């Protein structure tokens, strides 16, 4: 794993994909009042069906072109999911929706704001990071609950021998493995002074490795983009870390056909910064800014969020590089 200084600063270990919450939130909320007056068996059946609908809902948020609007709307959807989980705690689809939803919200709207606030108000930035950590922990908890339901004794076995425990995981578990590991590693990045959490890294690595083994193309480059940053500092792995990161970058770009900004941003803020290659850094981020957010509506929100990060990173060239080049930074 990379050193703790790098873990806590500019690089990111995963990117959001899907934003699969919210499309049914309002209509489901209206139905809940009716369910409350129904008989027990009817009520449980209806709640389970509502859970199915919410867990399988489409990508309304994903295609939105207004990140600030989504930022305000997502908490309502997340609390609705939690309300349904209180009634149907064994609904693995809802647990996955909660795990992915809280991780995405923490990443795209809380931790991102913390990074941007750090130079202006450190106290506010630290408060935001503390909040992001709590949200990531909630995401991780929901993911582990779902995996426990699918594989009895999973968490205990994971802590005893991660690789052995994960042999029981199958392709249907990949989304849970991804989101649980993503939230977990993000918690660790925000807890560099907590040795107990840092000691969890072997479990995170085992989960990501198993997910990659089962479905390397999951999320249309989600795992590859995660591994761009992660491989750069993985401890004990064979081969050149940079070569591994660049291989995942190429795979992510191929799978997304160049329509995702996240791989470009990830390589720039990990490998380019590490190598102090400001020319490559600017080139990658300007390519990220050039991604047409309307070409793939399902990735519109994610691309807008990553393009905002690209602009912020370009504004920090003088902080990130000892000898920046003389070209003009593109912050359009």
What does each of the following model-derived ranges do?
Residues 313:
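Short, positively charged
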Residues 34-61:
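Bacterial Sec signal peptide processing site at the extreme N-terminus
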Residues 23-37:
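Bacterial N-terminal signal peptides
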């Amino acid at each position: 794993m990379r050193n703790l200084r790098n873990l806590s600063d500019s690089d990111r270990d995963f990117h959001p994909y899907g934003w699969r919450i919210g499309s049914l939130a309002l209509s489901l909320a209206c139905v809940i009042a009716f369910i409350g007056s129904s008989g027990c068996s009817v009520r449980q059946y209806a709640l389970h069906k509502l859970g199915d609908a919410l867990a399988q809902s489409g990508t309304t948020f994903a295609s939105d072109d207004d990140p600030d609007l989504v930022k305000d709307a997502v908490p309502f959807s997340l609390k609705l999911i939690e309300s349904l989980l209180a009634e149907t705690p064994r609904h693995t689809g809802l647990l996955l929706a909660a795990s992915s939803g809280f991780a995405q919200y923490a990443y795209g709207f809380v931790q991102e704001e913390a990074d941007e606030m750090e130079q202006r108000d450190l106290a506010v930035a630290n408060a935001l990071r503390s909040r992001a950590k709590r949200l990531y922990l909630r995401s991780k908890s929901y993911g582990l609950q779902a995996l426990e339901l699918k594989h009895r004794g999973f968490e205990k076995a994971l802590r005893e021998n991660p690789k052995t425990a994960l042999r029981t995981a199958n392709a249907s578990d990949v989304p849970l493995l991804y989101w649980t590991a993503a939230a977990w590693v993000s918690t660790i990045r925000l807890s560099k002074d907590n040795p107990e959490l840092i000691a969890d890294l072997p479990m995170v690595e085992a989960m990501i490795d198993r997910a990659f083994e089962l479905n390397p193309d999951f999320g249309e480059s989600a795992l590859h983009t995660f591994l761009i940053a992660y491989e750069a500092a993985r401890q004990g792995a064979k081969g050149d870390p940079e070569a591994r990161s660049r291989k995942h970058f190429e795979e992510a770009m191929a799978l997304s056909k160049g329509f995702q900004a996240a791989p470009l941003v990830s390589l720039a803020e990990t490998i380019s910064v590490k190598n102090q290659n400001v020319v490559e850094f600017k080139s990658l981020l300007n390519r990220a800014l050039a991604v047409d957010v309307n070409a793939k509506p399902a990735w519109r929100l994610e691309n807008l969020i990553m393009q905002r990060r690209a602009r912020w990173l370009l504004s920090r060239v003088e902080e990130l590089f000892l000898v920046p080049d003389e070209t003009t930074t593109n912050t359009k």
